[in-house]
UniProtKB/Swiss-Prot annotation:
NCBIfam families: S20. InterPro entries: Ribosomal_bS20, Ribosomal_bS20_sf. Coiled coil: none annotated. GO terms for biological process: translation. This is Small ribosomal subunit protein bS20. It holds the Pfam family Ribosomal_S20p. PANTHER family: 30S RIBOSOMAL PROTEIN S20, SMALL RIBOSOMAL SUBUNIT PROTEIN BS20C. Residues 1-26 are annotated as: Disordered. Residues 1-22 have a biased composition (Basic residues). Belongs to the bacterial ribosomal protein bS20 family. The keyword Ribosomal protein applies. Keywords: Ribonucleoprotein, Ribosomal protein, RNA-binding, rRNA-binding.
Length: 100
């Protein structure tokens, strides 16, 4: 049996070859940013679960930056980025209120 994906034909035109090259680069960049997003969110949630208010606040600021970047580049919709920031912010604020 053949493997999962069928083999794609090579583009004939120069513009098609260029788009294929660009697609590979963009895919790698998007995958990297998506991974950075997941890591940032996980780190904030770990800090919240551990009850470390200062670390959670610090990591949340970094996560906000990553979320904004991803929304600006169009990897995630801006509403999804805003929703994720809001939910993370609520968790960090709840931790701050519980500590007070």
């Amino acid at each position: 049996m053949a493997s999962g994906k069928p083999k794609k034909k090579n583009p004939r035109l120069a513009s098609g070859r260029k788009r294929a090259r660009q697609g590979l680069k963009l895919n790698a960049a998007n995958t990297s940013l998506r991974s950075k997003y997941r890591t940032a969110v996980k780190n904030v949630e770990k800090a919240v679960l551990a009850g470390d208010k200062t670390k959670a606040t610090e990591l949340f600021a970094k996560a906000q930056s990553v979320l904004d970047t991803i929304a600006d580049k169009g990897i995630f919709h801006k509403n999804k980025a805003a929703r994720d920031k809001s939910r993370l912010s609520a968790k960090v604020k709840a931790l701050a209120l519980a500590a007070a």
